[in-house]
């Protein structure tokens, strides 16, 4: 049981690090702690930075057809990737908050570095399609997006990406406080995280690019590979 395990932990650095994990998976009312650990003053700035500094550079490296400045025009509207990508990661993060718990398996402390091994539920991306199917009066809008996506998905990575984000956000009525369900009907912790968080002697936590991408289940591999050795 998570609460019981946390009560047994007396190291203040571990407690401070776990507060960040709590702020994602248990109670997002404390998400300000995550903002602070990334040096952001509000959620909009946090998700913009997450997109521009953490996610986009990885995509630029990986895909030659990626451009942050992509704008998708559809049915008289313009959808800039730089606006809708951060919004997508916001609603996807909202969903993680519905987990209500995570499974803490182990932790290590080396100086100011706290290493956590835990399992957590993950977002069921199929639920975006389920939400889209509820818009009975607007199926032509969604089908059109699928058709557009199929046209470009092989040749233009960022165009494919923005179309997918528009589809997923439209399924949630473009509401930034909306969310989809997690995998499994009840608590189902399928994602294993190896996370590193720096905590100074005053209890101030800092989390770097690779580890925030891991915590929010955006790109888990780099941090998992870097931190896993601490537990072997």
Language-model-derived ranges and their functions:
Residues 33-41, 45, 50, 66, ...:
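Short glycine-rich, low-complexity/disordered patches
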Residues 23, 115-119, 194-196:
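Ordered hydrophobic segments in well-structured contexts
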Residues 67-173:
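Surface-exposed, charged secondary-structure patches
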Residues 37-41, 136, 225:
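Solvent-exposed, non-transmembrane amphipathic alpha-helical segments
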Residues 57-62, 110-114, 199-203:
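Solvent-exposed, well-ordered amphipathic alpha-helical segments
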Residues 1-95:
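Core segments of small alpha/beta cavity-forming domains
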Residues 1-2, 138-161, 176-232:
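Short beta-strand edge/turn micro-motifs at domain boundaries
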Residues 20, 101, 204-207:
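Broad hydrophobic/π-residue packing in well-ordered secondary structure
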């Amino acid at each position: 049981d998570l609460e019981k395990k946390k009560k047994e932990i007396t190291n203040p650095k571990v407690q401070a690090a776990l507060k960040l994990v709590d702020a994602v998976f248990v109670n997002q009312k404390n998400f300000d702690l995550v903002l602070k650990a990334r040096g952001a003053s509000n959620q909009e700035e946090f998700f913009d930075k997450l997109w521009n500094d953490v996610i986009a550079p990885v995509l630029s490296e990986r895909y030659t057809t990626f451009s942050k400045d992509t704008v998708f025009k559809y049915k008289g509207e313009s959808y800039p990737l730089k606006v809708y990508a951060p919004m997508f990661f916001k609603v996807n993060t909202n969903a993680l908050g519905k987990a209500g718990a995570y499974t803490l398996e182990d932790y290590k402390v080396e100086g100011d570095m706290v290493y956590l091994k835990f399992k957590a539920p993950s977002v069921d991306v199929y639920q975006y399609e389920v939400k889209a199917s509820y818009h009975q009066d607007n199926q032509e809008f969604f089908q059109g997006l699928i058709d557009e996506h199929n046209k470009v998905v092989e040749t233009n990575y960022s165009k494919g990406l923005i179309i997918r984000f528009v589809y997923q956000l439209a399924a949630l009525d473009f509401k930034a406080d909306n969310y989809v369900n997690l995998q499994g009907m009840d608590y189902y912790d399928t994602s294993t995280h190896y996370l590193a968080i720096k905590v100074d002697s005053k209890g101030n936590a800092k989390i770097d690019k690779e580890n925030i991408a891991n915590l929010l289940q955006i790109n888990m591999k780099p941090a998992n590979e870097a931190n896993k050795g601490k537990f072997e």
